[in-house]
Regions:
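Class I S-adenosyl-L-methionine-dependent methyltransferase catalytic core
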Residues: 1-164
Length: 164
C-alpha cells in the first residue's frame, strides 16, 4: 500500500454539503450493503445511521481522518469532499470492494485519469441520476448522481432516475 502523507487541511466551505436523511436512506436501501461498512465522511450521520450495525465512520472534524483509515471494508458509502475527489476515490478503492458516493456527475466524467482509475478498479455497477443538486436539497444546481463502483465489475451499468 502506498504511503499517504497526512496534512492538516482547512475545510473548504464548498466541501461541506450535508446529505438529507431521506436521500441517504434511499441510497442505502438501493445498495443493500452487508458486511463491514464505512461512512468515510460522517458529517451529521445521515448515512451512518442507515448502515448495518457494526459499521465504522471517519470525520476529520472529530479527529478520524479517512486517509489514515487502512482497515479493509466491504462497503464505503457517503458524500465525499468534492475538492479532493480523485484522492478520496483512490483511497476508497484501496480499502473497499464496493464504493458508493453521491457526487456531482462531472466529478466522475470530467477527467480521464478518474475514468482510468475506475476502469482499473472494476467499473460502475449502478448510477442514480437526480438531476439538479437542488432536487436533493443540495445548495447548487449542477447535476448530481449516486455512483456505485464495484471492484472487478465489467458488466452492464444499471441506470435509475431518482427522486428519492
Amino acid at each position: 500500500m502506498r504511503q499517504i502523507e497526512l496534512i492538516e487541511l482547512e475545510p473548504i466551505q464548498s466541501d461541506v454539503v450535508y446529505t438529507p436523511d431521506d436521500v441517504a436512506k434511499s441510497i442505502v436501501d438501493w445498495l443493500q450493503p452487508s458486511g463491514i461498512c464505512l461512512d468515510p465522511c460522517f458529517g451529521d450521520g445521515a448515512f451512518y445511521k442507515h448502515l448495518p450495525n457494526g459499521s465504522d465512520w471517519c470525520e476529520i472534524k472529530k479527529g478520524k481522518n479517512f486517509f489514515s483509515y487502512e482497515k479493509k471494508v466491504d462497503w464505503i458509502i457517503g458524500n465525499p469532499p468534492y475538492s479532493i475527489f480523485e484522492e478520496w476515490l483512490r483511497h476508497s478503492f484501496e480499502i473497499a470492494d464496493e464504493v458508493a458516493y453521491i457526487i456531482p456527475t462531472n466529478k466522475v466524467f470530467q477527467r480521464q485519469v478518474i475514468m482510468k482509475m475506475i476502469n482499473e478498479y472494476g467499473g460502475i455497477k449502478g448510477i442514480i441520476i437526480y438531476g439538479s443538486g437542488s432536487t436533493v436539497g443540495f445548495p447548487f444546481g449542477f447535476s448530481v448522481g449516486t455512483f456505485h463502483f464495484s471492484k472487478g465489475h465489467k458488466g452492464p451499468t444499471s441506470l435509475k432516475l431518482g427522486n428519492t
